[in-house]
Each structure stands twice: as structure tokens, then as C-alpha cells.
Amino acid sequence: MFILEKPYVSELLKDTLNKMGKPILDNAVARGAFKASPTPIYTESDFVEAYNKDRTQPVYSNSENTIDWIDNNLDSGDLPRKIRLFKDKGAFRDLVRDMYPDFFYRTVKLEKLDSINAGELPIPCVIKPCVGFFSLGVHMVESIAGWQEAINAIKNEVEQIKTMYPAKVLELDNFIIEECIEGEEFAVDAYFDAEGNPVILNILGHLFASSDDVSDRCYITSTEIINKHHDDFQSLLQEIGKRAELKNFPIHIEVRTDGRGNLGVIEINPCVLRAGV
């Protein structure tokens, strides 16, 4: 089952869905993408009915903008809970707390940020929305003085950012403060199959311009990168999938490795099957 949303539906995705003939939710984006195609589009009620007949079947999307619709319409199954587990960075940290017993993180309300004593934080650290998207609202803090600068920047950004994405994609009431994870960063697209086994689709090295760069601009990959890291990342995904009971579930995970077998998960984004679409 597929739900299409802005910002982009690629030609490859349209061609693939034309060949598959799987249910596609009727909305403005789907009608625009398939206006000259015989591909069937399901009304909301028919789509929900098809999902309820088999709640274990995969639901894929090209955009996190679909999360709000899923939360409101597919709530008879377990999908919204699993999406929320990974969209909420605080909930995810709780899930893997014993995997990283010495890792510092703290969740805090937006209005309470001014009351945080920066001297009690593991500087450098990062502060970001608990439910975030791309690098919006994310700030590196490299000194105690830089803490207040980050808080001031967040306050200035909040109202502007709220107009950009649905609330389920980006929530700015709660933030999480985390210690910085050192090492080389990678982005991994994967999915869990019907038996709960993780299948890695790609591994991308994430390059940054500087230590305080948090952008998503530059990624690289190669046979060497994939061969070097595949098995370690596979084992990590198996453990996370077991804890979250994931089946027929696509994810995008960002992870850092220190080159000595120690892996630190930055975050996991759910539901969107990015690779090749």
C-alpha cells in the first residue's frame, strides 16, 4: 500500500507503482501523478478498509508529510505507535537506554530551556526538537556561552518553522539535549521484512563542512564503504528491530562509528522508503 505526498514523486516511483498495481491513496498528489494513467487510486474509505483486512501488510510513502494522515486513519493497527516511537527522539532514547548506559540525554519543554544550567551539560552537546525533520531546529553547542546563543536562535526559529510542516512531522514544544556522538557518520536506508529481518538498501557516508555543520548536503557511497560497515550495521538493526517488534517497516537510520566497533545511533526516521524513489 502506498501514500504519496509532497514534495516530490519521481518518475521511477510512478513507473514502479504502475507496474505493481498496489493500493494508492486518493489525494491531490496521487491524482496529479497518475492523471493520465490507468493505475487505480483508492478512496480514503477503501484504502482504510483494505488496510484493516490485513494490518501486517507494508504501508510505504515517499514523504513524512503522510504521518498525520496515517495517525488519524490507520489507528486500528500498530503502525502509528511504531512511527511515533522513532519520530519521538526521547522515546527512541528510552528504547535503547541500556544499549548506551553512559549516554547523556535529557528532554525538556521549550518554555523550560532558559532554566537549564549549561554548566551541568556535557559540552559539546546538541539540542534538537524531539520530533524533528531534516536539520530544522538543530543546534550544536560547543561552549557554555554558546548554549544561550542556541536557545535564542531556537526561539527565533520556532514560529517560522511551525508554518513549514505538519505537526506530526515537526513538533517544537519538546526538545532533547544529547551529548555529541563522536566518529564518522553514515546514513542507512533499510526495511524489515515480514519475518522482522533487516534488509539494508544502501549505506552513505555523511560529510560535513565543519564541526558545527548539521546540514544534509553531502553524502557519498562506494563498494568499500558498504562492505566495511554492512555487517555491523546489520547487527545493530537486528537489535533495534527486535526491541521495537518491527516487521514490514522501512527506516532511515543515522549512525556514527569510531572505527573500533562502537556504534552510536543519532536517530531513526520511519515509514518513508527513500532509496530509489
Regions found by a protein language model. Give the residues of each.
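Conserved ATP-binding module of the ATP-grasp superfamily
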Residues: D102-F104, I144-E182, E239-R243
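ATP-dependent carboxylate/phosphate-activation module, predominantly the ATP-grasp catalytic core
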Residues: E182, D189-R243, N269-V277
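Short, charged N-terminal beta->alpha structural module
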Residues: M1-P38
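ATP-grasp fold ATP-binding core
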Residues: V96, L121-V141, Q160-G183, V188, ...
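Conserved metal-phosphate-binding beta-hairpin within the catalytic cores
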Residues: G241-A275
